[in-house]
Amino acid sequence: MFGMVPFRRNNNGLMRREDFFDKMFDNFFSDDFFPTTTFNGNAGFKVDIKEDDDKYTVAADLPGVKKDNIELQYENNYLTINAKRDDIVETKDDNNNFVRRERSYGELRRSFYVDNIDDSKIDASFLDGVLRITLPKKVKGKDNGRRIDIH
């Protein structure tokens, strides 16, 4: 009605709706098993964060990632999750020749600001592609400080 079409590429750098969907379908149908849009660093990975009275619980979906390729760090009130994925799918015929060989590599990082955490009690587990992190809160009213000796 007013000529406003989302995803239109003019000289202003916006993409036309048709180009957006054409590219999406081209990428989808040309990449059999490892779509690049799911683990390329731009899309990120999905994270659920739940707050309870005494803790935060984080669940991060990391499909295709091995436990050894996950690094978890809590520093300066930031929880940082680093994950790498290196997948190789090989299919050979009876003569040991490759019929298909595909590789998929990706690296992701996400950081979250979470304060009032008892960092000595942070716990994490990884099962079935889901990283679960428990971040206990500091106890209210308890002296959470420590004495600092002067040398």
Swiss-Prot record:
The keyword S-adenosyl-L-methionine does not apply. Residues 38-151 form the sHSP domain. Induction: By stress; by heat shock and also at the onset of solventogenesis. InterPro entries: A-crystallin/Hsp20_dom, HSP20-like_chaperone, sHSP/HSP20, Small_HSP. CDD domains: ACD_LpsHSP_like. Keywords: Chaperone, Stress response. PANTHER family: HEAT-SHOCK PROTEIN 20 FAMILY MEMBER (PTHR11527). Probable chaperone. Belongs to the small heat shock protein (HSP20) family. This is 18 kDa heat shock protein. It comes from Clostridium acetobutylicum (strain ATCC 824 / DSM 792 / JCM 1419 / IAM 19013 / LMG 5710 / NBRC 13948 / NRRL B-527 / VKM B-1787 / 2291 / W). The lineage of its organism: Bacteria, Bacillati, Bacillota, Clostridia, Eubacteriales.
